[in-house]
Amino acid sequence: MVVKIRLARHGVRNRPFYHIVVANAWKAPQAKPIETIGTFDPIPKKIDSQDSIPRIKDIQLNVERFKYWISVGAQPSDTVRSLAEKFQLLPKKPVS
């Protein structure tokens, strides 16, 4: 069984919200996952109403479960890989 770590879209129109899930690679993106290991909110939120620049995106991830699934051979999608690289959970992909 090929297992992937990918994003499953939830939320409403113009307001996406993603669950970071471990799922069979051959199933539909909205099919029931094996496990949900985190969430990702791509729309930045203002920290303070007076500050115009500081914004933050909400990412919650169970790092222990992420590392476990990577260790047993789960392949992260490109988006999940880039998120994991930002937090140094995976080494940067070599540029060829």
Swiss-Prot record:
InterPro entries: Ribosomal_bS16 (IPR000307), Ribosomal_bS16_dom_sf (IPR023803)
Oxidoreductase listed as a keyword: no
Subcellular location: Mitochondrion
Gene Ontology cellular-component annotations: mitochondrial small ribosomal subunit
UniProt main location, coarse: mitochondrion
Keyword Ribosomal protein: yes
A GO BP annotation: mitochondrial translation
Pfam families: Ribosomal_S16
Key words, A-Z: Mitochondrion, Ribonucleoprotein, Ribosomal protein
MF-aspect GO terms: structural constituent of ribosome
Family to which this protein belongs: Belongs to the bacterial ribosomal protein bS16 family.
Summary of the function given for this chain in its UniProt record: Component of the mitochondrial ribosome (mitoribosome), a dedicated translation machinery responsible for the synthesis of mitochondrial genome-encoded proteins, including at least some of the essential transmembrane subunits of the mitochondrial respiratory chain. The mitoribosomes are attached to the mitochondrial inner membrane and translation products are cotranslationally integrated into the membrane.
Complex and partners: Component of the mitochondrial small ribosomal subunit (mt-SSU). Mature yeast 74S mitochondrial ribosomes consist of a small (37S) and a large (54S) subunit. The 37S small subunit contains a 15S ribosomal RNA (15S mt-rRNA) and at least 32 different proteins. The 54S large subunit contains a 21S rRNA (21S mt-rRNA) and at least 45 different proteins.
Full protein name: Small ribosomal subunit protein bS16m
Chain's gene name: mrps16
